[in-house]
Amino acid sequence: MEANSADQKQKPNFLVEVNNIEKQLWTLIHSKTILHTDVSELYAKAGSTYEQIFKSNLQHEELQEVEFCLWKLHYKHIDEFRKGLKTNDHAKHMKAFKLFLSKAAEFYQNLISKVRGYYHRLSEESGEQKSRFLCHRFYICLGDLQRYQEQYLKAHEHPNWSTAATYYLEAAKSWPDSGNPHNQLAVLATYVSDELLALYHCVRSLAVKEPFPGASNNLLLLFEKNRSSPLQSLSTDAEFNYLNPSEKKVSVKERDLSKAKGELVAGIDLWPLVVRTTSFFFLKSSFDEFGRAFASTIRELDAAFAADDRNLEAMLESYQFMDTARKGPYKILQIVAVFIYIFHNLAEANGSDIVKEEVKLTNLALTMVFIVMGRVVERCLKTTPLDSCPLLPALLVFLDYLPFLLDKVEEEEEECRFDEKSKSAISYFFGKLVDILNQLKVKDKNCPAKTLLALWEDHELKSLAPLAPIHALLDFSSNMDLRESFDRGKELRLQRIISSAIDITTRQKKGSQKWLFFDNQRTHFYTTSGELQSNGELFHGNGEGRNRKCVTIGPVEIIPLENERSVPVEEEEVILLKPLVRCQSAPIYSSGIAAKPLSSDCTTSGNQTTTSNDSLRRTLSLIGSESFSFTQGLKDTDPQHLHLEEGTVSGRPPSLSAWVVDKNKEKGRLGLSKPNGLGPIDETGPVSAFDSLSINSSTEHPASSYSPPTPSAPLLPEDASWFHNDASTNKAESFYDQTRYMELPGIMKPYTNPPFVGISSSEWLRRYRESRNLGPAYSYQAQGTNNLRNFMAHGSSKFSLLARYGTPNDSSQNSTFHPQLYMEDHESRGEKLGNVQQSTTNPYGFSDDPGPFLRFLREKEWLNENGQRLRGPPPAYMNN
């Protein structure tokens, strides 16, 4: 307490004393110029007084004020010497200026030692803070003094900025929260014409707790200078396919990578383009101009990444003109830091009048960043061994920040979220990321304590404000050797990458879209197309067939591989049904089906069992009813041949019947007439959920109730294909009536043709008997068997149940493929069915026929009335 009281008493005295000394000094300079001998004496006296003030245990704010006054004393001397250099007495002023800079540098170096010693003896935390703050300010002054010496005293020599850069970097290390050292480094970067390095340090001087006041203007000046400079590598006709980011249209130019590191053509062309592309997020510009700049940037980036590992590492050096001892892949790390600041700056922009513009800029930034980082991941995969890739530190930093970025974007309103281009870019990045993650070994999904050690890249970006939540979890105090080189801690870096990726997979925020998934059992990463799953392909990361593609139609996944079960997506995805799994044979793609598009409307109810004949008939009748097709022809079971045209897949369960036809019977379109028929194929999987699906996209219809008829009437299959399900329209269904599908594209029905609502099969039979006497049909027998249990599945196709009066059915004239047009569209369904016998000829020229339904009733009536020999268990196609 007594020491503090003494310091408080001495403080006013020292301040008054130094104030008086400075008054005498400026009076002497103005009267006798700065070259007078008394000037140096008064300067030394003022310096010693300031030393005493720093030892008086001032408050932090007071130390800032005193330190500023001390630097102002030196800066006034520097300003006077610069004025003298313009006079006739140039040589004397130059000599005196050089002497003053040397004395001033020596003064600050001694002051650092004295301040550290004084505050170290205090043994207080506040004393340590004051010491670090003052030393950081003194290092900045030392850097400025050295910079002036190189700038003014070595005008005819090649300046060496390494000493000044070393002081600035030491200042940043002493007090990371200050933006002043980085602003000074940005100034040095402009001296060596390194625009990317200047951009990086301008960003660092802004994205800290204590931003440098003039850094914002310096950043804008840097962008304006870049805009005004012509760039030879900027192509006015360059284009980029945002919906296919992995596409590389331009060929890599031949580059002489044997040149000096600082003269690499790829680097000279690339880095100014990065600055030009970044400027669009800070200066008002045309989006068309951005497209050309970005396309040119990606072209040069591809060219740079085409270099081998040695030349790539040399290309990524950043401080070769400022500090030759500072080595590492700084360029790519600086680009990632700039990307992070872009999102940080956009998030802080407020104002409803610019919301739309900010949304566009955000999506544009997402597109740019994820495409560039996708290229980074691609290049990492080409490095052997993988842990030696110089791009991995930048990838780790980006993965650490990625959960915060995705959460920040998804916090916006619905219209502010990802657009088509940004979704494509994000999917591209994660698709490449999965490849590199699955090459690494996941030792422990819970990040061990040793992996929380700060690595080289963490020390480099320490105090970058957007990364503060991440740095708070890292240990910067131990294992300081890790900060020396990016080559150290390779194993820790790989484990950190895996840990960051797992953190991305565990994002549980409500409404957030998941881009990456992790299988805990197999320690395997996989990705899915998320909200776009109904328009394309899914990648599965676990199971026997991981990383294989499967076709997705609506909420059900159909995997065209035998005995392979799919992995349902995580709970975040909206899955109506678990995937149905093939148990016997893979789907067959006949030449007949491949010749024409396959409609997505080929659907059957999940609550019924259908015969393969019905499945094939239903499939063939709906060919061409919707727009999407299997464009690859479905020639084999290779999943790579399954391609769906984008944006046309209905969000409905597919027709499984179309996939289960027998291989041997599906060689041709007219295989229904061949012996032994098409046997049923067992399907396993939950099917009860099909009941909840709606019949029409715009109108909900209740499920058709069905009661078994009396024994005297024939039993009807639940999927009777002779009625149209739309009870509101009451239109007759003709397999070749294309207008129905053209008017209602994309409508999916759980029953292809459910029974007419409101009338039972018994009532139909009664009405039919009253209107027409049924004569017994000609007898027939199933070939080779007396058991009709599986007649429809395995019975004779020569004597079809659909053939009129039991006559053999010619394969070329199968009634399934030549349906009747029963009546006009304006008639109601009841009128059509009641007057069916009045039909004479249809527009297709076919003869009068009571139709497949009435023939079916006649034949089944005959079966019920004739002997017990033919009676057996219900046929397989009846769902009894």
Swiss-Prot record:
This is Nonsense-mediated mRNA decay factor SMG7-like. Residues 669-711 are annotated as: Disordered. It comes from Arabidopsis thaliana (Mouse-ear cress). Pfam families: EST1, EST1_DNA_bind. The lineage of its organism: Eukaryota, Viridiplantae, Streptophyta, Embryophyta, Tracheophyta. Disruption phenotype: No visible phenotype under normal growth conditions. May play a role in growth and development. The keyword Repeat applies. TPR repeats lie at residues 149-183, 184-217. Keywords: Repeat, TPR repeat. Residues 691-701 have a biased composition (Polar residues). InterPro entries: DNA/RNA-bd_Est1-type (IPR018834), Est1-like_N (IPR019458), Est1/Ebs1-like (IPR045153), TPR-like_helical_dom_sf (IPR011990). The keyword NADP does not apply. It comes from the Eukaryota.
